[in-house]
Amino acid sequence: RLIKEDMKPALGVTEPAAIAFAVALARNHLPEEVTRVVLHLTSGLYKNAFTCGIPNTTHVGNDFAAALGLVAADPQKELLCLDGVTEEDVKKAEGLVKNGIIDVIMDRITSRIEIRAVVMGKKHEAEVVIRDAHTHVVEIKEDGKTIYSADNLAQAEENEIPFIHRCSIEDILDYIKTVPYEEIAFVKEAVILSLIHISEPTRP
């Protein structure tokens, strides 16, 4: 289950896609034009997205991923949310970054995946929290009121140790040696999909 959660199809590197997804989802819960975005990231995610190129653009980084999430991303596509980004979308995102409406804050030092995307308008705000997997939405708020909370939110508190951190090297090696092929056959499918994508020409 852990492997499947971390191997969802994505357009480009998963961290910028996850940021765009979070911002786009928050945007959909705001009943007015967005005037400011505040993005809270853990250090591991911040670092991984900081220098990553974003597909269909010549840009990198957390702020630009958030800006594209605001103007162009489809949250229903999750990590494929930036598929179909146009040159016009890129120009709009450049303007948002230049105008300084995107604030990116590194909250704490940890390798744990966590994104808190807050979008604000003149009268309202919306917030989306993603934790432990790039599309695992654990909370959605509108004007401070929780409208969605994952069933296991109580077990996903910040101080809980993620499952993978509780596994020893021996546990992992034992799993590798004993897992039935059928349970991990999807890994081969992911490799094939990746090979197809890297063989495609990039957009000029």
Task: Indicate where each model-derived feature is located.
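Generic N-terminal amphipathic, Lys/Arg-enriched alpha-helix
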Residues: 1-11, 47, 171-175
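Short, N-terminal intrinsically disordered low-complexity segments that are rich in Pro/Gly
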Residues: 7-16, 180, 184
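Short, conserved micro-motifs enriched in small and acidic residues
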Residues: 12-17, 56-60, 204
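Alpha-helical support elements that line or immediately flank enzyme active sites
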Residues: 16-32
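Catalytic-core signal marking the mid-to-C-terminal active-site face
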Residues: 33-190
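Conserved small/polar residues in nucleotide/adenosyl-binding loops
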Residues: 196-204
